[in-house]
Amino acid sequence: MAIVVQKYGGSSVATAEKIKNVAQRVGKVFDGGEQIVVVVSAMGDTTDDLIKLAGQVTSDPHPREMDVLLSTGELVASTLLAMAIKNIGYKAISLSGAQAGIKTDTTYRKARIVKIETKRILDELEKGQIVIVAGFQGITDDMDVTTLGRGGSDTSAVALAAALGAKICERLTDTDGIYSADPRVVPNAFRLDEIGYEEMLELATYGNKVMQPRAIELAELYNIPIRVASSFNDNPGTLIHGGVSMEVRNKVRSVAYDMDVAKISVLGIPDKPGIAASIFVPLAKAGISVDTIVQNSSVNKIADLTFTVTKDQISEAMKVAKPIAKKLGASDIVADSELGKVSIVGTGMQNTPGFAAKMFDTLSANGINIELISTSEIRITCIIKESKVKDAVRALHKAFEVEV
């Protein structure tokens, strides 16, 4: 029998009734002759509630203890789902990440999966069990519990699918697939039947929150198809895979946006080797992730350097960058947190002229000023004022007549 891995998000298991609904769906897959491994997230807002609870105890929780605490959310969901499945007549067993053989490195709160020892899961499947695995977690060689970071249950599911040789990983959530744009912003946005790994990775990185980028990278590496569908209806969803037939057809595949953008500009710094490194190395050591970087052409060997970070890191980034800017003799350093970004994505854009020009012209025609630009072979991203982002999404979706 083929193995199917299903992953249910927090909204799908948020209440007892929803857990019972998931149990019924899992049972139907089992009845179809598949061996099934189910990965679950914590119920609803459990993870956020646990973080708040820790904050009431201490302002500086130890990373190891936080991982132990946060891992309990998925344990609750997995055990309740196993109970619900047993209650309707199936054999089921819940496993923690450790019991499932998920081994990680020692980077608490953002651990990476090193390997998965699949013997326990395979043994349980051979016994006719439906295996429920707590997502988002693993264990180190020293038997310490770790968590995989936000969205880590997606990573758990895809990694398990790869290790088990599953035929597919199904990501069941409160949305019924990947859309040409956010349907809450663009009412006539449509669901995509399929999308390539490369396109999906760009969308996930630049604003589409349905799947985590790490999970997409893993899926592409091990060629694991992912079906994104709703846990509340039977719509077929969107298949994420490596189908080469899509490359020629898709021009602009989807429009994505992200409101979590802040900008720092270091003005009037010397334009010479080592200046950028003197700024970005300390930022990296402080755990600050930098996205778009732009340096203007120098005048009299003086230039301005601008980069973006997430809004929650702007204060820490300024704290790190200010003394460096002063040491470099910068004329000023300024921050702007009222920004967002909008991106167009599609493999058909590769080596095809005109997309950037059309995007910029569309934004200009709608009175939207572009602050920064970044690109890849299949993506163009513009940093703009936060208040204009949704207008930009609607305008671009219409201008490019985004294709099915």
Label every PLM stretch briefly.
Residues 32, 88, 222, 286, ...:
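Conserved dinucleotide-binding and phosphotransfer motif residues
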Residues 23, 27-30, 162, 220, ...:
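A structural alpha-helix within SAM-dependent methyltransferase catalytic domains
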Residues 43, 175-177, 222-226, 230-235, ...:
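Glycine-rich beta-alpha junction loops
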Residues 1-216, 308, 384-385, 400, ...:
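Nucleotide/pyrophosphate-binding catalytic subdomain
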Residues 237-404:
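A conserved regulatory-domain signal marking ACT and ACT-like small-molecule sensing domains
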Residues 134, 190, 202-260:
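Phosphate/diphosphate-binding glycine-rich loops and adjacent basic-rich segments that engage nucleotide
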Residues 168-172, 226-228, 291, 372:
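Short hydrophobic alpha-helical runs that function as membrane-insertion/retention elements
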